[in-house]
């Protein structure tokens, strides 16, 4: 079923996250849909788990002759009747790591997800710790369009598959995924992939985007594509990757990246925004002249590649020079605390936030430590360890250290709109 067509007919217009517990088959599912193994880094391949955010694109096609759900495919020719299929839309997948130690990476990816596929393995009891944690994270970030994939149905007997289904139904009761469809799938053998594609079309529509606003892109990856020993005159500039939340970018545009890079000045660390030019745009494995909202986009720049290597610009925002939100070193949040911490084996009550406490904050794709400096009812002011750039009213995921790990305890709405 997987599409081996690398070049998509159009730029992806929606980002779908694959979330869930480690080893439940998220990356295998993405491969069965896209033909791309999203865990491409050597350490990931060696350990068999996703460490960084994975990403892959696919096109959805619809056969004009076959009945649903069989009419949905990832190939331009219908595999059932050999009829030329009609292109529906292109999609980017963001494959989030399921290991508890990598929750911060999952939350950074959640910031750019328009919908999510929660993958739950039928051969394990539900919920596993990160199944619970990832669903809570999706709820906190505000992801409402969710599909549940009951994976690995090929390795369990029918009785266990039915029991697993009941466990899933009980687990999602009262959550944002209470009414989500539960689709039994074998990602390994590509069973029921057409049913999943049908559900994606029904449950995760392309959000309305405003392309008239000043462009704004969340950076979730950055690279140096040059091989060691490349002569200086042949070096390519740094590459940034992410999703455009509003507006559009064109080749030749001058852009600003905030908060930028840290430099030492008079014994203090300050952050300098970067100004550069877009020299190339890539989406869906092809070069484009203009990139619009939705999907994952690669942006070639004239930046010194030492800035962008090894995800060095992750968490920054890119936009037109002078039109980005202010850079902030302090945030005031209207906080909403969960009843129970998520991700722990035991269900622990969340205590109230205290002055002087250290919290881990996810603002857009940025992750940052913050010290609580004042509290007034549910308004919490936090001094950041390093500045961030984010639009006002952004949702901020809040984590606290519990049993030696950062655990999600709630979220806040950013109220600060002035540089500090």
Named regions from a protein language model:
Residues 87-92, 96-102, 110-134, 139-162:
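Conserved Switch II/interswitch segment of TRAFAC-class P-loop GTPases
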Residues 8, 170-313, 317-324, 329-337:
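Conserved catalytic-core segments of large NTP-driven translation/proteostasis enzymes
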Residues 36, 99-100, 123-126, 152-156, ...:
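Conserved nucleotide-binding/hydrolysis micro-motifs of P-loop NTPases
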Residues 15-18, 156-158, 304-420:
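C-terminal effector modules of nucleic-acid-centric enzymes and ribosome-associated factors
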Residues 2-104, 113:
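P-loop NTPase switch module centered on the Walker A-proximal segment
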Residues 121-123, 144-162, 182-193, 315, ...:
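G-domain G4 guanine-recognition motif of GTPases
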């Amino acid at each position: 079923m997987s599409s081996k067509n690398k070049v998509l007919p159009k730029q992806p217009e929606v980002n779908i996250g694959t979330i869930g517990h480690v080893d439940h088959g998220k990356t295998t599912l993405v491969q069965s849909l896209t033909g791309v193994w999203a865990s491409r880094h050597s350490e990931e391949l060696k350990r068999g788990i996703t460490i960084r955010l994975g990403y892959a694109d696919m096109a959805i096609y619809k056969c004009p002759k076959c009945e649903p759900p069989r009419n949905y495919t990832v190939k331009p020719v219908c595999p059932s009747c050999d009829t030329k299929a009609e292109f529906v839309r292109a999609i980017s997948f963001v494959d989030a790591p399921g290991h508890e130690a990598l929750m911060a990476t999952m939350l950074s990816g959640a910031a750019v997800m328009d919908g999510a596929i929660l993958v739950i393995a039928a051969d394990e009891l539900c919920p596993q710790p990160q199944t619970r944690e990832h669903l809570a994270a999706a709820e906190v970030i505000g992801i409402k369009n969710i599909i549940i994939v009951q994976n690995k149905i090929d390795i369990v007997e029918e009785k266990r598959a039915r029991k697993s289904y009941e466990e899933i139904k009980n687990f999602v009761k009262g959550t944002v995924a209470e009414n989500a469809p539960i689709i039994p799938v074998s990602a390994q053998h590509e069973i029921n992939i057409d049913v999943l594609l049908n559900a994606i079309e029904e449950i995760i529509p392309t959000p309305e985007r405003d392309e008239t606003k000043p462009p704004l892109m969340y950076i979730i990856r950055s690279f140096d594509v040059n091989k060691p020993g490349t002569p200086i005159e042949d070096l390519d500039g740094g590459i940034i990757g992410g999703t455009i939340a509003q507006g559009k970018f064109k080749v030749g545009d001058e852009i600003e990246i905030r908060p930028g890079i840290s430099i030492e000045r008079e014994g203090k660390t300050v952050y300098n925004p970067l100004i550069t030019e877009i020299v190339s745009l890539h989406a869906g494995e092809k070069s484009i002249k203009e990139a619009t909202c939705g999907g994952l986009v690669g942006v070639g720049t004239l930046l010194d590649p030492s800035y962008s290597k090894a995800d060095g610009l992750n968490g920054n925002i890119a936009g037109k020079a002078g039109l980005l939100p202010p850079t902030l070193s302090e945030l005031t949040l209207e906080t909403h605390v969960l009843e129970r911490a998520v991700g722990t084996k035991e269900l622990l009550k969340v205590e109230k936030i205290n002055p002087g406490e250290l919290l881990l904050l996810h603002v857009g794709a940025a992750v940052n430590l913050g010290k609580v400096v004042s509290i007034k009812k549910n308004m919490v002011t936090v001094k950041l360890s390093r500045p961030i750039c984010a639009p006002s009213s952004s949702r901020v995921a809040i984590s606290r250290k519990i049993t030696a790990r950062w655990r999600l305890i709630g979220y806040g709405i950013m109220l600060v709109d002035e540089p500090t």
